[in-house]
């Protein structure tokens, strides 16, 4: 197993729908059988926010969750290297796509009281950021008028602390590419874009991270969990012994059961 999941064709979605006017503002919707209303997972793919990594590889996770009775709305978004990608466009696309669940709910029988976000790697950053949007003050470039309320959020080996990601030069400087520069020069941007700086969120947050992750150090998830708990959040972390960076998105992995159980528990 391992990184090969990135290159394996995933099961097809039920529908590919645009949430905005740009060619990259779309999502893949997968629906479980039955009349609903269905709980929903908004899924954010990883790839260090870079254009060369799209949503295809996260389709395996989406299909597995949908097989467990959860509707999945997997978002594509403009990334670094795409026109309009990077700060703020990447984050605003995530926000626009998440809010579009309201438009999908009626036709597709989705339960707006049971919506969570889940993301992997850079997508873990976006998933927790979506849960924090209500903390962003009006007037900020990332502020939204009426962000969709989430019931919980899950980070799978996520880059949930952008300042630390900058310090460690994750992905050979991926945070700098996303944000447009260092935190000492762009403190305001980092403050409203980095999930760890927006705690407490007031919802349940779950973090899963493998001990053998050589892409995103486990310390980033550990530090977020400690900061969120100190701030009063219900934030729990599971350390997955022997798991690499990609095991958490691979339904064939021995660790997949913990991922699925975590999502199901949040939506129970």
PLM region spans:
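Conserved alpha/beta-hydrolase "acid-adjacent" motif
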Residues: 214-223
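Catalytic histidine-centered segment of alpha/beta-hydrolase-like enzymes
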Residues: 243-254
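Short, surface-exposed "cap/lid" segments of acyl-processing enzymes
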Residues: 33-37, 41-64
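Catalytic nucleophile-loop/oxyanion-hole region of alpha/beta-hydrolase
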Residues: 52-61, 74-114
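Mobile cap/lid helix-loop segments that gate and shape the active-site cleft of serine hydrolases
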Residues: 9-12, 22, 164-197
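Short beta-strand/loop motif that positions the catalytic acidic residue
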Residues: 207-209, 213
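N-terminal cap/lid segment of alpha/beta-hydrolase-fold proteins
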Residues: 1-35
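Primarily recognizes the serine-hydrolase "nucleophile elbow" in alpha/beta-hydrolase
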Residues: 99-168
């Amino acid at each position: 197993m391992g990184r090969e999941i990135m290159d394996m064709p995933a099961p097809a979605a039920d529908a590919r729908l645009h949430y905005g006017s740009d060619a990259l503002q779309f999502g893949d919707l997968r629906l479980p059988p039955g009349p609903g209303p269905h709980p929903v997972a908004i899924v954010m793919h990883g790839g260090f926010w870079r254009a060369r990594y799209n949503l295809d590889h996260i389709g395996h996770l989406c299909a597995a969750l949908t097989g467990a009775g959860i509707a999945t709305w997997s978002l594509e978004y403009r990334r670094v290297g795409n026109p309009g990608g990077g700060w703020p466009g990447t984050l605003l696309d995530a926000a626009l796509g998440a809010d579009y669940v309201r438009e999908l709910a009626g036709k597709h029988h989705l339960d707006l009281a049971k919506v969570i976000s889940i993301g992997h790697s850079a997508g873990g950053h976006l998933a927790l950021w979506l849960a924090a949007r209500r903390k962003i003050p009006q007037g900020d470039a990332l502020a939204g008028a009426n962000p969709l309320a989430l019931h919980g959020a899950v980070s799978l080996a996520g880059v949930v602390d952008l300042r630390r990601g900058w310090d460690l030069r994750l992905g050979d400087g991926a945070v700098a590419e996303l944000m447009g520069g260092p935190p000492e020069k762009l403190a305001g941007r980092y403050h409203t874009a980095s999930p760890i700086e927006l705690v407490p969120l007031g919802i349940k947050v779950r973090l899963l991270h493998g001990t053998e992750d050589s892409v995103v150090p486990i310390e980033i998830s550990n530090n977020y969990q400690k900061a969120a708990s100190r701030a009063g959040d219900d934030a729990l972390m599971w350390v997955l012994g022997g798991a690499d960076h990609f095991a958490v998105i691979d339904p064939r992995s021995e660790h997949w059961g913990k991922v699925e159980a975590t999502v199901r528990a949040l939506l129970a």
